[in-house]
């Protein structure tokens, strides 16, 4: 009798732990992909900055700090404390929207040793992976009631004919914003993944 109870307990444990294992695997893939995108973003931005004069870098950085990224319209945690208090579904939802906002602008992201062909497909793969994680959640279907209303402009006048100075500024802004957003997504997915391990310390 005791042996039967033990066997049932082990079977029950195996069934209940399987979704967590699958979830951890999906999260690991998503985190790995966004880490790679973040590294690409850092590399492109660094290569672009190195092509500028010191004064140009200083002026562009000053302007960027006073400006906004297109994705700033996507409501997200304002600091690490709010990030840690946010639910997994909320972090996944924000990550999805951030990645989605770069699908069109990413076609213009390239520089030095990185081609645009390295970025757009990886963004699409990451978006698909995050969507799978959302759909795997019970409340996933309720996360996007207003998704059709979220239409972000493709970085304003970036695709218009600009003067040399304006073109330089827009390129700097685009690359800096991409790096910033990939860092956000990496942070959110890392925290969300950590939540799957009850004993883990998910502090930032």
Swiss-Prot record:
Q: Name one Pfam family in it.
A: Hormone_1
Q: Could you identify this protein by its name? A: Somatotropin
User: GO terms for biological process?
Assistant: animal organ development; growth hormone receptor signaling pathway; positive regulation of growth; positive regulation of receptor signaling pathway via JAK-STAT; response to nutrient levels
MF terms per GO, please?
growth hormone activity; growth hormone receptor binding; metal ion binding
Q: Does the keyword Cell membrane apply?
A: no
The cysteines covalently paired via disulfide bonds are: 69-177, 194-202
Q: What is its main location?
A: secreted
Please tell me the species this chain comes from: Perca flavescens
Per the similarity annotation, which family is this? Belongs to the somatotropin/prolactin family.
């Amino acid at each position: 009798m005791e042996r039967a109870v033990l066997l049932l307990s082990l079977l029950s444990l195996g069934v209940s732990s399987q979704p967590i294992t699958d979830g951890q695997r999906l999260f690991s893939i998503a985190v790995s992909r966004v880490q790679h995108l973040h590294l690409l973003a850092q590399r492109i931005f660094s290569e672009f900055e190195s092509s500028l004069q010191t004064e140009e870098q200083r002026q562009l950085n000053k302007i960027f700090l006073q400006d906004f990224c297109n994705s700033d319209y996507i409501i997200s945690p304002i600091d690490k404390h709010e990030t840690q208090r946010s639910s997994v579904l909320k972090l996944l939802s924000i990550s999805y929207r951030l990645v989605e906002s770069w699908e069109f602008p990413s076609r213009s992201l390239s520089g030095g040793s990185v081609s645009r062909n390295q970025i757009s497909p990886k963004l699409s793969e990451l978006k698909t992976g995050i969507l799978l994680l959302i759909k795997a959640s019970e409340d996933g279907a309720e996360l996007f009631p207003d998704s059709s209303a979220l239409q972000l402009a493709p970085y304003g006048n970036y695709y218009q004919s600009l003067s040399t100075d304006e073109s330089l500024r827009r390129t700097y802004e685009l690359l800096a914003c991409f790096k910033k957003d990939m860092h956000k997504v990496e942070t959110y997915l890392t925290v969300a993944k950590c939540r799957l391990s009850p004993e883990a310390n998910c502090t930032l």
